Amino acid sequence: MACNIPNQRQRAMSTSGESLYEILGLHKGASCEEIKKTYRKLALRHHPDKNPDDPSAAEKFKEINNAHTILTDNSKRNIYDKYGSLGLYVAEQFGDENVNTYFMLSSWWAKTLFIIIGLLTGCYFCCCLCCCCNCCCGHCRPKTSTPEEEFYVSPEDLEEQIRTDMEKDMDFPVVLQPTNTNEKTQLIREGSRSYCTDS
C-alpha cells in the first residue's frame, strides 16, 4: 500500500517572522487596523464560496485566516515578530510564558555553560556530593565545637547523677502550694518577675 505523500515540501519553521506578513501583503510592524483591512479584502477575494472552481482558493483562505488570527493576537504577534513560526510552535508546546526561557536555554552560551559545569563537576557528580554528602566524603563538613567523645555518658555516671539530684530534692521541701485560680486571676503579676522559689 503506497503512502499518500503530497508533492509539496513541508514548510520549514522560520525564525525571521515575516512570512505571515507576506501572505497578507503587508510589511513587518503593520498596525492592527492595516491588518484587519487587508484581511477583509483578501478573505473576500479568496473565499471558497466565491471561487468554487478554484481548489487552491480554500488553501489560500486558510492561510489568510491563520495569518490574521496570529497577527491580531498581541501575545502571539510579539512571539512571531521575535522568533518567527518556530516561536509559535514552542508556544504551543510549552506555553506563551516559557518561550523566552526555551530560546535562552537553547542558545549556544547556555549549552556551553552546561557542558563546562558538567566537565568541572565530573558529570555533576560533585554537585550531588555537595548536596547529599557534605562534599568530598565529608571533608568539607562543618566542624563541631566540642568533640564527640564528650557526649557519651556512662550508665554509672548517669545513676550517680540521679542519686545526687534526689538527695538535693530531699534537703529542700516544697513550702508553697499553688494558689487557686479563677477567671479574674492575673497570670502575670504586675511588678518585677521573680523566677526564684526561695522566699
Swiss-Prot record:
Its main location: membrane. The gene is Dnajc5b. The modification Phosphoserine is found at residues 14, 16. It is a lipid-anchor. CDD domains: DnaJ. SUPFAM superfamilies: Chaperone J-domain. GO terms for cellular component: cytoplasm; membrane. Keywords: Chaperone, Lipoprotein, Membrane, Palmitate, Phosphoprotein. Residues 19-84 form the J domain. This is DnaJ homolog subfamily C member 5B. Palmitoylated. Gene3D superfamilies: DnaJ domain (1.10.287.110). It comes from the Eukaryota. It comes from Rattus norvegicus. Interacts with the chaperone complex consisting of HSC70 and SGTA. It is found in: Membrane.
